[in-house]
Amino acid sequence: KESLPVEKRSKTGIVSTFRNFGAIVHNPRYMLYVLQLAFAQGILFAYIASSPFIVQQHYGFSPFAFSICFAVNAVAIGVAAAISVKFRQPETGTLTGCIGMLCLSVCVMIALYNGCGFWTYELLMFALLFTMGLTFTSSTTLAMDSERRYAGAASALLGALCFASGGIVSPLVGLGNILVSTGVTFVVCAICSLLCTLWAMRKVPMKVAMCRIFR
């Protein structure tokens, strides 16, 4: 059931809808948080695309064992998303998650390149996906809060760009050595995600942004 009051609903046509998308794209703070989410989703989809081959072919686990690992890692994302609401300011959750993603992505890349054991890989991936989950709730909140006028279109664009990012990134992990390409993909997405967050924070006075984080 539609929850938006009737008097606040838009009655515009298709052309006006696309004009709304144009206005949204020109909102830099909204777009930066959406891009942060898109790059974080890139890490998620890179993991989804590569993990069956890494766990089953490289480490030699059965499909059932892989499904258990996949489920455990999914729990990490859900728990992190729930914990992120405990931060006083959503900027704190996003920045913490982005810094964690970068640090752990570098660790995963180095570990895979050096032929780490399964448990090292699994623990690092659990931690990486946990830090990624911290950004999902907080960044979505920040993005939607910065584009309230066209909230419906903003939500649609956010989802579209995030899944488009996953579709673009997923094939990249299959280029060359999957262990190397997966690690590199993680690091590149994590760097871009952190840069988008830092740039978005500069769209408000830096003193205000830092006060929100450490308050």
Residue positions per predicted region:
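Helix-loop junctions on the cytosolic side of multi-pass membrane transporters
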Residues: 1-11, 200-210
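Juxtamembrane intracellular "pre-TM" segments in multi-pass secondary transporters
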Residues: 2-34
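Pair of pore-lining "gating" transmembrane helices in MFS-fold secondary transporters
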Residues: 26-44, 126-127
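Short amphipathic helix-loop junctions that connect adjacent transmembrane helices
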Residues: 49-64
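Juxtamembrane helix-start elements in MFS-like secondary transporters
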Residues: 61-70, 121
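Transmembrane alpha-helices of Major Facilitator/SLC transporters
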Residues: 66-87
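C-terminal transmembrane helical hairpin of 12-TM major facilitator-type secondary transporters
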Residues: 94-138
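A late C-terminal transmembrane helix in Major Facilitator Superfamily
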Residues: 130, 142-178, 185-188
